[in-house]
Amino acid sequence: DILAAFRVTPQPGVPPEEAGAAVAAESSTGTWTTVWTDGLTSLDRYKGRCYHIEPVPGETDQYICYVAYPLDLFEEGSVTNMFTSIVGNVFGFKALRALRLEDLRIPPAYIKTFQGPPHGVQVERDKLNKYGRPLLGCTIKPKLGLSAKNYGRAVYECLRGGLDFTKDDENVNSQPFMRWRDRFLFCAEALYKAQAETGEIKGHYLNATAGTCEEMIKRAVFARELGVPIVMHDYLTGGFTANTSLAHYCRDNGLLLHIHRAMHAVIDRQKNHGIHFRVLAKALRMSGGDHIHSGTVVGKLEGERDITLGFVDLLRDDFIEKDRSRGIYFTQDWVSLPGVIPVASGGIHVWHMPALTEIFGDDSVLQFGGGTLGHPWGNAPGAVANRVALEACVQARNEGRDLAAEGNAIIREASKWSPELAAACEVWKEIKFEFKAVDTLDK
């Protein structure tokens, strides 16, 4: 069975048992009345069952309801169908004040019907010939308004300075000021020039997201013809059907696939209603993607440390034990499905590098947009500053130093022999984003 953990807030007067049963019925075989066609099938075989209910600590009107769904309710290899059933009409149910899907347990039998990520962590490292450290990226800013040629210039400066990747912003598609084909051409020129100068393999996430699946695939085909290593998709706004189609194309044609989670906070940020991001992360691993944005813990975007590390493990590891202290409700076995690299992006700069290296480890992408292009000397020096900071943190970690305790000292030591890093340290020494997270663990 597929197991689901729902956070249920019933209307006043509705007992939790009734609310849990209603969720199970409405998201499987049930409707609001008995119908004569119920007798034409075996409902006991197909109906969802609410098998356990527990109160939420610290809340008087919230319950975690566990529901089991028989596998025959779901089409093989379709995240779209899985979500249509489990989180379809039930979220508008009048008997509930709020409903949130906290976690899913996907059984190996269903996982084996999915291709998953086009390539996975190890294949990506082999393609890029980069080992032993996190990868470095940068989102090109301003996100909208640059011409294709100026956009390509910004890409080149970042890549030659030492970054592994640059990135289209999620809302860069094909606008009047920069059509997609022009952007692809100038970015390809930039990365080939940077590769020739540095001797390193470089990439730019070319956003293939489009208004139709056909147009999206056309853009991915052109990227492959240019010989670039990676394309990008906005998987929530683009949709799971489009994402799975693109992931299959990328597997068949040797392209890596970077995934942006634009629109996720509309769905996952409120603690009592919606879908938790750990579920969206699991769905992405099934649908397919080699990278996905996962929050930073230390930057400008929402993300508590324990919760973030919980779904980072769900993205990367083969087997994850149940651990409620990190928000993981079920043990998950991914069998042979490749892993996804988490991307830390949003309001981060060189002073965050020790914490990011310690939190996310080697199999991650650390992405500095403003933290690269905001350098007072320009894009290339900004890239140099980030690369020097990263190499210093990795070396210190490998020597046994404690990044959490000595992080600032490590950055200061490195800045003594890197003027680019010293300038970056001076610019961002006072920049902090210290706000309390909205989505926290139940205690």
Curated annotation (Swiss-Prot):
Cross-referenced CDD domains: RuBisCO_large_I
Pfam families noted in UniProt: RuBisCO_large, RuBisCO_large_N
Cellular-component GO terms for this entry: chloroplast
Reaction equation(s) it catalyzes: 2 (2R)-3-phosphoglycerate + 2 H(+) = D-ribulose 1,5-bisphosphate + CO2 + H2O; D-ribulose 1,5-bisphosphate + O2 = 2-phosphoglycolate + (2R)-3-phosphoglycerate + 2 H(+)
Miscellaneous comment as given in the Swiss-Prot or TrEMBL entry: The basic functional RuBisCO is composed of a large chain homodimer in a 'head-to-tail' conformation. In form I RuBisCO this homodimer is arranged in a barrel-like tetramer with the small subunits forming a tetrameric 'cap' on each end of the 'barrel'.
Main function: RuBisCO catalyzes two reactions: the carboxylation of D-ribulose 1,5-bisphosphate, the primary event in carbon dioxide fixation, as well as the oxidative fragmentation of the pentose substrate in the photorespiration process. Both reactions occur simultaneously and in competition at the same active site.
Family: Belongs to the RuBisCO large chain family. Type I subfamily.
Name the UniProt record assigns to this protein: Ribulose bisphosphate carboxylase large chain
Lineage, uppermost ranks: Eukaryota, Viridiplantae, Streptophyta, Embryophyta, Tracheophyta
Gene name, Swiss-Prot/TrEMBL: rbcL
